[in-house]
Regions:
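Hydrophobic pocket/interface hotspot
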Residues: 82, 94, 102, 117, ...
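C-terminal motif of bacterial Sec signal peptides marking the signal peptidase cleavage site
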Residues: 20-23
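Hydrophobic helical h-region of N-terminal Sec-dependent signal peptides
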Residues: 13-18
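Surface-exposed, charged secondary-structure patches
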Residues: 118-160
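Short, low-complexity N-terminal intrinsically disordered segments enriched in polar/charged residues
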Residues: 25-92, 96
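Bacterial N-terminal signal peptides that target proteins for export
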Residues: 2-11
Length: 184
């Protein structure tokens, strides 16, 4: 190899090294980077039979899952299951989770019965892609519960595609051992 080629190769390697180091950021120590393995305990996504990782289109943020009681966790799980069913347009699952007399109020103020709302999801008038459950606050009082959170909806609502952030509350009642979404 010629001396000129060696200098060019050395210069190129130095430039690449500088790019790699600076790409890691000012405060990153690349010599101590480790990979942390997820714990195999009942913490994180899978706790006491509640496997939140199965909800591919639902992201839950702003809550310490380890601090939840079993009842609070079950409410959050049902809410996530409902949101996943919305993104899958799984009307059968939604029917299982929602009372028959449910009335939906859209951010526009438009109100719909359960079946009208489900019909719009089924025919694609309402299409949910992902749903975030941000900063949920869960309150349980025996057979009644509510969850207040900010929805982060990536959706196409009647031809208007976008990401919509809305704060709201869902109310639940326990019926035959199952939590059902109800009107207030």
């Amino acid at each position: 190899m010629k001396r000129r080629d060696i200098k060019s190769t050395s210069l190129l390697l130095m430039v690449l090294l500088v790019l790699i180091v600076t790409a890691c950021g000012k405060n990153t120590d690349i010599t101590t980077t480790t990979v942390k393995e997820e714990p195999k305990t009942e913490s994180g996504d899978e706790m006491k039979g509640y496997d939140f990782s199965t909800f591919e289109n639902v992201e839950i943020t702003g809550i310490d899952m380890d601090s939840l009681t079993d009842e609070e966790r079950s409410i959050l799980y049902v809410q996530a299951k409902y949101c996943q069913a919305m993104t899958d347009a799984d009307i059968d699952t939604m029917r299982e989770l929602v009372s028959e007399d449910m009335i939906y109020t859209h951010m526009s103020g438009m109100q719909q019965t359960r079946e009208e709302y489900f019909s719009d999801i089924s025919d694609g008038s309402l299409r949910y892609y992902t749903i975030g459950i941000a900063d949920p606050i869960i309150e349980v009082d025996q057979a009644k519960a509510r969850i207040t959170y900010t929805s982060v909806l990536n959706a196409n609502a009647y031809g208007s595609r976008g990401t919509y952030r809305m704060k709201g509350t869902h109310h639940y009642e326990k019926s035959d051992g199952l939590w059902i979404l109800v009107n207030r």
